[in-house]
Amino acid sequence: MSSKAETTELRFSFVLETPAAEPEEARRHFAGKLQFETDVADLMYDLQKGNTDFTIIDTRSPKSFALCHIPGAMNLPKINAETVAELPKDKMCVVYCWGVACNGSTKGAMKLNELGFCAKELIGGLEYWRKEGGAVEGTLGNDAPMHWNMNG
């Protein structure tokens, strides 16, 4: 027979340690998340269906953008009133950078919001886009590095 301490240890659960939110509270939370971000699969689907009701913005450096970027994306490493003057305010902006460890898209989306644009961040950025087989454009295309470096 096992001791009570061993039984308690076996029954402990990190998943169940904190109770789940009530369904309506959880629904509001998840609906809120979807207002701020979109994922690679949703963007791929829309692009494959020809939906162009949004603008894709890459916040990485011009050099990195030239090497590899999502088709149709525009490069805006600096977002301010001057650089977005030609952007249509009636289109949502989908903003990305390298990946989950890069906050360039978060900063870019925030700056776009400050300038009156609606923006969502692409979860996982270019890294997840490429890992999920998304098409890329650029001088190196799929041969481009998968991460940021000091030279680009």
Locate each region found by the language model:
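Flexible, polar/low-complexity N-terminal or interdomain linker segments that lie immediately upstream
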Residues: 1-64, 138-152
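Glycine-rich, highly charged phosphate/nucleotide-binding loops
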Residues: 74-82
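A generic hydrophobic-segment detector
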Residues: 117-152
